[in-house]
UniProtKB/Swiss-Prot annotation:
Gene Ontology molecular function: any one: RNA binding
Compositionally biased region (Acidic residues): 548-560
Annotated keywords: Nucleus, RNA-binding, tRNA processing
Protein name: tRNA (adenine(58)-N(1))-methyltransferase non-catalytic subunit TRM6
GO biological process per UniProt: tRNA methylation
Lineage start: Eukaryota, Fungi, Dikarya, Basidiomycota, Agaricomycotina
Superkingdom, natural source: Eukaryota
Segments of this protein annotated with the region Disordered: 1-61, 128-171, 510-560
Subunit structure: Heterotetramer; composed of two copies of TRM6 and two copies of TRM61.
Start-end of Polar residues biased regions: 1-20, 128-147
Organism listed in the record: Cryptococcus neoformans var. neoformans serotype D (strain JEC21 / ATCC MYA-565) (Filobasidiella neoformans)
Principal location: nucleus
GO cellular component: nucleus; tRNA (m1A) methyltransferase complex
PANTHER family registered for this protein in UniProt: TRANSLATION INITIATION FACTOR EIF3-RELATED (PTHR12945), TRNA (ADENINE(58)-N(1))-METHYLTRANSFERASE NON-CATALYTIC SUBUNIT TRM6 (PTHR12945:SF0)
One Pfam family from the record: Gcd10p
Length: 560
C-alpha cells in the first residue's frame, strides 16, 4: 500500500542550469586532489573548517532564474573557471585581477581578461601590440606534463605552473589579450566527388620530411607570425599535401591547429563540464562516476523542483550539485556527514553557487541525526568572565546554533521526504535501513557504487524486506562513436564501466494477510500454519455455546 504517487520525470540529458558566484566562508573547502593541484593558476584560499552552519541568504527581489542565467553566461571576478585547451585538457583557474594565468606552451594572459567574457566561446591569446602572436611560456611549464603528474609529483612540484612574484613582474604574458577566434569553415566534401587518395603518400622519416623544422617555426613566432600563417607555411612546404583526401587534409589541419594555436575556451559551470574535468584530473574523488550513470541516477530518484531529498554524498559534492542544479535551487536537501564540520563541498565551489542558490542545503552528522541526541552544554567557566559583553555574545551565538540544529533535526524526524540518494563508501544496507523510515510512500531510493558486490548484497537484503518494492540492480553503459561521411567507428579509449545503480520504491507494508497467502505458505512448507489459531478459535466457540445453552429445569423453575 502506498501513500503518494509521484509524477516521474524522464530527462534525456543532464540539465545545464548552473551559475557562478562566490561561496560563503563555511563552504570554502576544496575537494581533495583538485583545488590547489599543479596546473591551477593559483591555489584557492580557504578558511579552516568551521562548525558553524551556513546561515540563510539575504532575501532578494531578483528572480532566481536571472541569478542562474547570469552565473551560467558571464564570468565575474572571483569565479572558478574551467579552461579547455587545444589539447582537450581542462585547467581550473580562479579569476582574480592581479594574477597571471600561465598555460605553458599555450601562452599566458592576465586573469582580468576573463572578466566579463561569455562562456563556451573560443578565445585566442594574442599580443596587445598587434603582432597577432603571443609569447609561449618555457617548455618546463608545459601544461600537458602537469596534467599527467602523480600525487607524489604534485607534492614535489606544488609551485609548478603557479604565479610567483618574480615571474609575474617580468612575464611577457601581461601584454597578451583575449579575442574571439575566427575559424575557417570545415571541409564539407561529398564521397562521390573525392578524386584524391592516399595511394601515393609515403611514410618518411623526420630527416626526409620537407615541412618546417622546429627552429624555423621558432623564428616565425619571433617575427610575429600568426598561427594561421605558420600553418599556411607548413602547407606550402608539404610536397604531397595535394595528394591527400579532403578528410585527411582536415585531420592534418586540425592536428596543426592544436599544435600552433594558443586558444582557451571557458566552459560553463554545468554538471557535464565539471564531471568531465574531474574524470580527467581525479576520477577516484568522485567514485569514478560517469555522466550517463549520473543522469540515470537523477532520473530514477525523480529529482524535480520543490522536492525534498536525503543525500549521502562522498563524491566531493558532485551528487549534491547535480541534485541542486536539477531542482533549480527550489526545495530542500539534507546531507549527512561523518564529522562535526561541514562536508567538503569542493565541487560546489567549482560550480560557483551563490548564497541564495545554496539556501536549500542543510547538513547533519550521523550522531546529530539520532532521535535521542542532545547537544552538550558549553563548559562552565570556573572564574567569572572578564568581559561580560563578549560572554553574552558567545551565549547568544551558541543558542542560535542550538536552535538551528534542533530545527534541522525536527525537519528530518518529521519525515515526509521525497527520496533518498546514496553515493558513499559506507555500508549501504545500514544507511538505507536507517533513513527509510523518514521517507514518504512511493519515494524512490537510489544507491550508486562503483563495485558490483556491494550492491548485490544490498539487493539480496532488500528482497527480504517488505518495505522495498521493485528493487533492481542496473549497470549503465555508453560508448562514444566517431561519425564521418561513409565511416563510423567507436572511440577505443572509452571507460569499461560507469558503476552500478540499485533503486527501489519505498512502500508501507500492510498488516493484512490474505487467505491465498496462507494457502501458498501451507503448500510450500507442508504444514498447516493456522492449526493453532483454529484450535483456539474452536475452543472459544465452544465456550460461547456453553454459555448460551439453557437448562430446561432452570427454565421451568423460572416459569413457576
Amino acid at each position: 500500500m502506498t501513500e503518494k504517487q509521484q509524477n516521474s520525470q524522464q530527462p534525456s540529458q543532464l540539465d545545464s542550469t548552473a551559475s557562478i558566484s562566490a561561496l560563503p566562508p563555511q563552504l570554502q573547502q576544496p575537494a581533495a586532489g583538485i583545488t590547489g593541484a599543479p596546473g591551477n593558476a593559483e591555489a584557492t584560499t580557504s578558511e579552516p573548517p568551521s562548525t558553524k552552519r551556513p546561515r540563510k541568504a539575504i532575501e532578494s527581489s531578483e528572480p532566481l532564474t536571472e541569478v542562474i542565467l547570469r552565473r551560467l553566461t558571464t564570468i565575474k571576478e572571483g569565479d572558478t573557471v574551467l579552461l579547455r585547451l587545444p589539447s582537450d585538457l581542462v585547467k581550473s583557474v580562479v579569476v582574480q585581477g592581479d594574477n597571471l594565468v600561465q598555460l605553458g606552451k599555450y601562452g599566458a594572459f592576465p586573469a582580468s581578461q576573463l572578466i566579463g567574457l561569455h562562456y563556451d566561446i573560443t578565445y585566442e591569446i594574442v599580443s596587445s601590440s598587434g603582432s597577432g602572436a603571443s609569447t609561449p611560456q618555457p617548455q618546463s611549464l608545459d601544461f600537458s606534463t602537469e596534467e599527467t603528474q602523480s600525487k607524489k609529483g604534485n607534492k614535489k612540484n606544488k609551485n609548478k605552473g603557479k604565479d610567483t612574484a618574480a615571474v609575474s613582474k617580468n612575464n611577457p604574458g601581461w601584454n597578451n589579450i583575449l579575442r574571439p577566434l575566427k575559424r575557417q569553415l570545415v571541409v564539407d566534401a561529398v564521397i562521390d566527388d573525392i578524386v584524391e587518395t592516399n595511394e601515393f603518400i609515403e611514410d618518411l622519416s623526420e630527416t626526409e620530411k620537407t615541412t618546417l623544422s622546429h627552429d624555423e617555426i621558432a623564428e616565425l613566432r619571433a617575427q610575429g607570425c600568426t598561427p594561421e600563417e605558420i600553418i599556411q607555411a607548413q602547407i606550402a612546404r608539404h610536397e604531397k599535401f595535394g595528394l591527400k583526401t579532403d578528410f585527411s587534409k582536415e585531420k592534418w589541419r586540425r592536428r596543426k591547429e592544436k599544435k600552433f594555436y594558443q586558444t582557451v575556451q571557458p566552459l560553463a559551470p554545468s554538471i557535464p563540464n565539471v564531471l568531465y574535468h574531474y574524470n580527467l584530473r581525479s576520477p577516484q574523488s568522485i567514485l569514478h562516476l560517469r555522466d550517463d550513470t549520473l543522469s540515470q541516477l537523477l532520473t530514477m530518484a525523480n529529482v524535480r523542483p520543490g522536492g525534498r531529498y536525503l543525500v549521502v554524498d562522498d563524491t566531493g559534492g558532485l551528487i549534491t550539485a547535480a541534485v541542486l542544479e536539477r531542482m533549480g535551487s527550489e526545495g530542500s536537501i539534507l546531507l549527512f556527514n561523518e564529522s562535526d564540520s561541514p562536508p567538503a563541498w569542493g565541487i560546489l565551489q567549482t560550480m560557483n553557487f551563490s548564497d541564495r542558490e545554496l539556501e536549500p542545503i542543510k547538513w547533519l552528522n550521523w550522531l546529530e541525526a539520532e532521535e535521542e541526541y542532545q547537544k552538550p552544554a558549553p563548559p562552565v567557566q570556573a572564574e567569572p568572565p572578564t568581559n561580560p559583553i563578549k560572554a553574552a555574545a558567545k551565549q547568544r551565538k551558541y543558542a542560535a546554533q542550538v536552535a538551528e540544529l534542533n530545527n534541522t533535526r525536527n525537519e528530518l524526524h518529521l519525515g515526509g521526504w521525497d527520496g533518498l540518494i546514496l553515493a558513499t563508501t559506507l555500508n549501504p544496507i545500514s544507511v538505507v535501513a536507517r533513513l527509510t523510515p523518514y521517507l514518504l510512500g512511493s519515494a524512490p531510493i537510489v544507491v550508486y557504487s562503483p563495485y558490483y558486490q556491494v550492491l548485490a548484497e544490498l539487493l539480496s537484503w532488500s528482497k527480504k524486506d517488505p518495505n522495498y518494492l521493485n528493487d533492481t540492480l542496473t549497470e549503465s553503459w555508453e560508448r562514444t562513436y566517431q561519425v564521418l561521411p561513409g565511416r563510423t567507428h567507436p572511440m577505443m579509449t572509452t571507460s569499461a564501466t560507469g558503476g552500478y545503480l540499485w533503486n527501489a520504491t519505498r512502500v508501507h507494508p500492510s498488516q493484512f494477510q490474505p487467505e491465498s497467502h496462507q494457502r501458498f505458505k501451507r503448500r510450500k512448507t507442508g504444514k498447516a500454519p493456522g492449526k493453532e489459531q483454529l484450535s483456539s478459535v474452536a475452543k472459544d466457540e465452544e465456550a460461547v455455546n456453553e454459555s448460551l445453552e439453557i437448562d430446561p429445569e432452570e427454565l421451568a423453575n423460572e416459569g413457576e
